[in-house]
Amino acid sequence: MNNSITLTLKNYLGRMPTVNEYYMLKSQVRNIQKIMFFNKDIFISLIKKNKKKFFYEIKSSPSEMRLHILEYFMKQQKTSSIGKLYAIIELQTILVSTYTDVLGVLTTKAPYVFPSNVRYEPRSMKKIAHDILTTINVATVSEKVMGRHNVSELVTNVNLLMEEYLRRHNKSCICYGSYSLYLLNPSIEYGDIDIMQTNSRIFLINLAFLIKFITGHNVMLLKVPYLKNYMVLRDDEDKHIIDSFNVRQDTMHSIPKILIDNIYIVDPTFQLLSMIKMFSQVDRLEDLARNQEKATIKLATLLEYVRVKHGIIFNGKVTNMPMPSSFDHEKRIITVDTSRYNFSFKKCFVYLDENSLSSDILNLNADDAIDFENVSNSVFLINDEIMYTYFSNTILMSSKDEIHEISARGVSAHILMYQILTDGDYLIPLSDIVNSLMFKEKIPIFSIIPRDKKTGKHGIINIEKDIITH
């Protein structure tokens, strides 16, 4: 055994390594050296500054935070489990290598914020939005409490941190949802801040440590199999703190965005289409039934944005939206006629089962499918003037064989999202799909076609228990 490696492991473990520990951990010596040489006094100072700036309401003394930090950096001395040692080394390495650049930088002097004059007060749109939502408010409220509704008391503090994070890291992190609309219209209320970024895992691990060192409480990262590249941070009561989708840099580049107060938000035009698409998901309609007023102000703001940005006239005149579609129950495929618009495809096959789409793309021997990850929740392939794509939401039926207009419109919105992401033609169909929302009669739901069931195990990162499962 190499004496230098043995000495490093001995100093790190606080004891002489066993033969098994030596051979299992010798590949980690560089990381271990990085951990041991890490200046913990400077790190403790950064944590204190983060606490003072973002978590000032939480009662924890500097000595308590120092103790939490030093205890964690000696945690490897209290276990002989190789699996736990690997987890500790991996998490400590992430912490010492990335914390300063990811969260520590938030305490330094901020760059000048160029205030935005983009503000929308959608008075004229509120009545239109209210009438639209009244028409599609057709779901029966269930008693089930969704995880996103069970929020932690830490959300307010994390939101304060996230506002600064979004400004400092606006090349790699973008927001959408209620907070992004709040930036357009301050009368909108928001809960947690919805984000997409190119380094979600690193960010959430660092945030988990920051919360642990300040509060002394454990937080857990959870990766769910049915959402691509998604991780959620939960507190020790299993309440939601924040979640984040990870996207590739090329996907981030493709997302249409606007800059407000040094923060990039997903272009509200794209968010409007996403909202229309999500109304096909039955639990989102249940949210609408619980609180229509909350959705009204959001929709009104989005409608006002597209009215001003694209000059859309709201008169209810439309001839081709939702685009004509039919549903094959056995194959779970929707066929959409897109021929009346200036698209590069005349027809679209919309699959409700992602594996079936992947199989058919393979059979087509086509290798130019485009994957926009969670931005669209689907790949897109155009082959022989036919688009192939996947729809991840439930499908509502208005009769045994007829797709409910809410879902037909949601599928049409999904197709228009592709047009925007690929810089295709979308203004005329955008005007049509928005006007198709107006002057409608409420149609009850006849049945619900369930969405694709994803299989797989949850991934967990538990700092307290030294567990990392991918």
From Swiss-Prot:
Catalytic activity: RNA(n) + ATP = RNA(n)-3'-adenine ribonucleotide + diphosphate
Highest taxon in the source lineage: Viruses
Positions of the catalytic residues: 192, 194
EC number: 2.7.7.19
Gene3D superfamilies for the chain: Poxvirus poly(A) polymerase, N domain (1.20.1270.320), Poxvirus poly(A) polymerase, nucleotidyltransferase domain (3.30.460.60)
Annotated SUPFAM superfamilies: Poly(A) polymerase catalytic subunit-like
EC class (word): transferase
Keyword Zinc: no
Keyword Transferase tagged: yes
Keywords: ATP-binding, mRNA processing, Nucleotide-binding, Transcription, Transferase
GO biological process: mRNA processing
GO MF terms, alphabetically ordered: ATP binding; poly(A) RNA polymerase activity
CDD domains (alphabetical): polyA_pol_Pox
Subunit structure, interactors included: Heterodimer of a large (catalytic) subunit and a small (regulatory) subunit.
Function field: Polymerase that creates the 3'-poly(A) tail of mRNA's.
Family: Belongs to the poxviridae poly(A) polymerase catalytic subunit family.
Name of the molecule in the record: Poly(A) polymerase catalytic subunit
